[in-house]
Swiss-Prot record:
Propeptide residues, chain positions: 22-49
Residues with PTM Alanine amide: A81
Organism: Chilobrachys guangxiensis (Chinese earth tiger tarantula)
Keyword match Transmembrane helix: no
Record remark on domains: The presence of a 'disulfide through disulfide knot' structurally defines this protein as a knottin.
Superkingdom to which the source organism belongs: Eukaryota
Known function: Probable ion channel inhibitor.
Disulfide topology: C51-C66, C58-C71, C65-C77
GO terms for cellular component: extracellular region
Protein's name according to its UniProt entry: U15-theraphotoxin-Cg1a
Signal peptide span: 1-21
Length: 83
């Protein structure tokens, strides 16, 4: 009888260790998934443009509008007429 109880306690201790180890592995996999999601999120953020797009404020002296646009007298990037 004492041996059966001792064996039951040893089995419970072993089961506890196995469950704890599997939780650690599961936690690590969750951390990997979350870090991958956050890494992708950084890639999806809009990049800063080097030039100004249509209708955006600009500075005529800097000529900071994108190709085929010019800085109008209203200090907005506009489409070049002609070519």
């Amino acid at each position: 009888m004492k041996a059966a109880i001792l064996l039951a306690f040893a089995g419970l201790a072993l089961l506890s260790v196995i469950c704890h180890a599997s939780e650690n592995v599961e936690q690590d996999s969750f951390e990997e998934v979350f870090s991958a999601i956050f890494a992708m999120e950084d890639d999806l953020k809009p990049k800063e443009r080097v030039c100004r797009g249509y209708g955006l404020p600009c500075t005529p002296e800097k000529n900071d509008c994108c190709q085929r646009l010019y800085c109008s007298q209203h200090r907005l990037c506009s489409v070049k007429a002609g070519k």
